[in-house]
Amino acid sequence: NGWAAVNIRAVAAACGVSVGCIYNYFGSKTELVSAAVESIWNDIFRHPEDEAVFQDTLSCIQWMYRQMEYGCPQYPGFFTHHALGFVQQDTAGGKQQMRQTWQHILDALCSVLRHDAKVRPDAFTEQFTPEQFAGILFSLMLSAVVQQSFDPSAVLEIVRRTIY
């Protein structure tokens, strides 16, 4: 039912329990939404059966874009709501949840960049680190989500020209 259904009363009704039962687990709508967001990100970026996607940066990016493309119809409005909704929240908890969720993706990208045997030895420096490049790649990924454009070919070419 979309994001409108992610509230204490709707979840209680869907589960056939009292509102108080839901409040035993979630103290506020923000906590409930945060748990839903984390669960959805975990579903979209669940660990792939084929570990080869983490062997090189190009394979990882292709996999990430495929997963985002999968996630859009599975969870309509999720990406734009999460990308924009938590940023606009005044609550520190919502912003912290967003940072934690995204940090997991950034950490995975950094790990792939560091272990990718195809990366030129001089590709990264003190002024241009794997963390910075992962941040750039992640920004491009968020842009793709907002635009609903899941063709990674331009991003793949940027990777080839920048670090290979």
Predicted feature locations:
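Short, charged helix-capping/linker segments at alpha-helix termini
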Residues: 4-5, 120-128
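Helix-turn-helix
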Residues: 1-31, 35
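Helix-loop "lid/cap" segments that line or gate small-molecule binding pockets
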Residues: 50, 65-73, 81-89, 112-113, ...
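Short, basic, alpha-helical segments at the C-terminal edge of helix-turn-helix-like DNA-binding modules
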Residues: 38-45
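Amphipathic alpha-helical packing segments from all-alpha helical-bundle domains
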Residues: 73-77, 81, 90-119, 128-131, ...
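Short helix-capping/turn signature of helix-turn-helix
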Residues: 3, 26, 82-90, 143
